[in-house]
Amino acid sequence: MSTLVKQSLKELACLEDLQNAIGRYAHQMGYSAQVIQTGFRMMFSHWNDAEFHGFIQNEIPELDARYFESFFDIGLSFEKRRSILPCACSERIFLVSASTVPSAAFQDVLLTLLLPVHLIHRPSHSQSGFFQSVHTWLSLKAPRLAERWELIEPTYEDLYLSKIISSCDALNISASQKTIEHFRTLRDGLPIEKRPKKWIEHGHKVSAIILFKDDFDALTDADFDAIAWDASIWDQTGCLSPKSIYMECSQQEAEQFAHQLIAAFDRVAEQLPEIMPDTASLAKRNSALIMAEIEGCRMMHANRNHDCIIIHPEGGFPILLPRILNLFPVRDATHELVTRTAHGQALGTKKLLSESEKNLFSQAGYHVFCGLGQMQNPPLTWFHDNIGTLRPYLMCNA
């Protein structure tokens, strides 16, 4: 591709421009500034020509290659955007962002604005101030994008939300199942002709790591650091963060593994410090750990952050809370992973999986397969939840 892309969307991949907003709102978003900066830096590393090209081929394969450069031009007019699109798309989109991983919401906003749409964005309470600051910044950097991005207050006021839902022809929500169900109720309370034609949901998913016997026996210090990194980015929140490790080993070997991993967590903590969890979160965490101990789990705690490793006995269930990594020493990791996971997302491995193995794990929902240390670093070409980022709004096959 030509250098036009580098002068357009990639021009916004500037962490320095976001430093003020990150520093001011990091604590409100629930992360340390170092964690947020690292997450954005990893995301921006994928804003390059090759991945832009792959992104368009995945999301809008019908787009004429002659228009690839124009598509990423942040100064392109609304009318021109509409003229180069190969088919119709939603015109008013209501985007409801999750309360975790602000870089993901940031990227969703900017990529969606590359379509000829008006975007109504409801960030979470914790990220509202940050995105207000980002909107001000974008108004200076890319006014033609910012003028089509409308931020609203993160309210749960039903009448207000119903009015917005009825005014849009697409709604995209990333949230807990409870919040998703609330928005469904609001939609179902509207006359059929007032309901959005496109309804996209991204509910909670669970990611994991699998270590086969040969992989377990060949682990290096670099592998332990990579696992700790995967579980520390974004404080182990977000759908790509590993919550459990299924590994083919004995309980005794699992304890030795945990000792080595705790040391890795302490090393990674220098780069990815956490902020002190609030009182309610600590109380919930402590209650869960007490119950796990009663159920026969072994635990090890890091010295720096609140990282905790839990070694489960046979038949145990993972604790899905931040900074808790569940270990399951088993005989057949494949069987345990497939039978115990309902909503898988990313699967980290030491070795590359075969296509037949990927097909098997996809039965449990896993569709992101990557090496250790790369779980929270998806390429721009990742087809989010097997749904996509722009594809759901298009009517090319309608």
Where in this protein do the model-derived segments appear?
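N-terminal Rossmann-like NAD(P)+-binding subdomain of aldehyde/semialdehyde dehydrogenases
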Residues: 1-90, 346, 351-354, 370, ...
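Short acidic, S/G/P-rich loop/turn micro-motifs used as interaction or catalytic elements
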Residues: 61-62, 66-68, 73-75, 177-180, ...
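Conserved small-residue-rich beta-alpha loop and adjacent elements
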Residues: 63-141
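Short, well-ordered alpha-helical microsegments
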Residues: 105, 161, 179-181, 354-357
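Short catalytic-loop micro-motif centered on adjacent basic/acidic residues
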Residues: 120-122, 170-173, 347-348
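Hydrophobic packing residues within well-ordered alpha-helices of enzyme cores
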Residues: 131-134, 183, 211, 257, ...
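Conserved NAD(P)+-binding/catalytic subdomain of aldehyde/semialdehyde dehydrogenases
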Residues: 142-251, 376, 382-398
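NAD(P)-dependent aldehyde/semialdehyde dehydrogenase
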Residues: 225, 233-398
